[in-house]
Amino acid sequence: MLFHAAEKTGHHFTIGAAGVDVFFVISGFIMWVISDRRSVTPVEFIADRARRIVPVYWLATGVMVAGALAGLFPNLVLTLEHVLASLFFVPARSPSSGEIWPVLVQGWTLNFEMLFYAVFAGSLFMPRNWRLPVVSGLFLALVIAGRVVAFDDAVMLTYTRPVILEFVAGMIIGEFWLKGRVPPLAVGSALFACSLGGFALIGVLGLPFDELTTGPLAVLLVIGVLSLEANGCVRALSLPGLLGDASYSIYLWHTFAISVVAKAGLAIGLGAPATMFAAVLSGTLIGIAAYMMLERPLLRRGRARRVTAGLAGRAAE
């Protein structure tokens, strides 16, 4: 969000985009750990992810489409093919820019997540000790194919990027976590500090800003934070907990608020630092509001339906 707020208000916070790399590592970690602690079938896994991800994303995409049709987003070019590809998480080139982006631009990360979900769900058919090697081998093969073959197709260009290995790294970290093999506090603190310093040096040294530089740093950051948590240095606080719960809604909706605030700040002559602060605050607040009024009620309704269906099924037996 800081990256988008800085971009819209004339600042530079390119390194903020590296949050995606951290997110992919965490995604692999969470899927691996949760699947080990709670038995779930491939169908149940996919259904659970779809219930969480799809409805709110479709709603946010619908708002973008409606806004474009109403003339609120003059730079957004719509085609039926691109809208459908966006809704069904198929990587496709945007008619607006030629980039491989969905209608809701930040949704490009969900295109990767859907690959992760599909492959991970498939791995649940296998014995546990096969899963990590098979997923790792598949993703490594895809990356090698991307280096060897000059793909032009948007799907293959997306799914052969080295960034997918960050998900595998998260799974590997999760396996070490489950075995209790976490770095001691001194090592974890050093890894955490090195990762933050490394992110800062990317801009200072003019290093390439891609997953080959940000990916390893994201891995170090996650390992460092896990070490801090395992050693009791991370406390559970209500505000960070709320932001974590609302993170998906913040991710989906923050750009709407940031765009409005950036334009308003420019119109009234508000200074760039104040505009950026207001943009970040508004993006956070709209995400929390969307979580409380949209995402959380939808999730609760879905859980209630599953409980009702389960009770009805047992009664029928």
Curated annotation (Swiss-Prot):
What's a Gene Ontology MF term here? acyltransferase activity, transferring groups other than amino-acyl groups
- The record lists the membrane-crossing segments as 14-34, 53-73, 100-120, 132-152, 185-205, 206-226, 268-288
The membrane-topology field of this record reads: Multi-pass membrane protein
* A Pfam family this chain is assigned to: Acyl_transf_3
Q: Report the GO terms under cellular component.
A: plasma membrane
Q: Where in the cell is it found?
A: Cell membrane
> Which UniProt keyword terms apply here?
Cell membrane, Exopolysaccharide synthesis, Membrane, Nodulation, Plasmid, Transmembrane, Transmembrane helix
Determine if Cell membrane is one of this entry's keywords: yes
Q: Which domain of life is it from?
A: Bacteria
Has UniProt tagged this entry with the keyword tRNA-binding? no
Some GO term, biological process aspect, for this entry: which one? polysaccharide biosynthetic process
Tell me the protein family, please: Belongs to the acyltransferase 3 family.
Q: What does this protein do?
A: Required for the acetyl modification of the third sugar (glucose) of the octasaccharide subunit of succinoglycan (EPS I).
Q: Per its record, how is this protein called by name?
A: Exopolysaccharide production protein ExoZ
Which species expresses this protein natively? Rhizobium meliloti (strain 1021) (Ensifer meliloti)
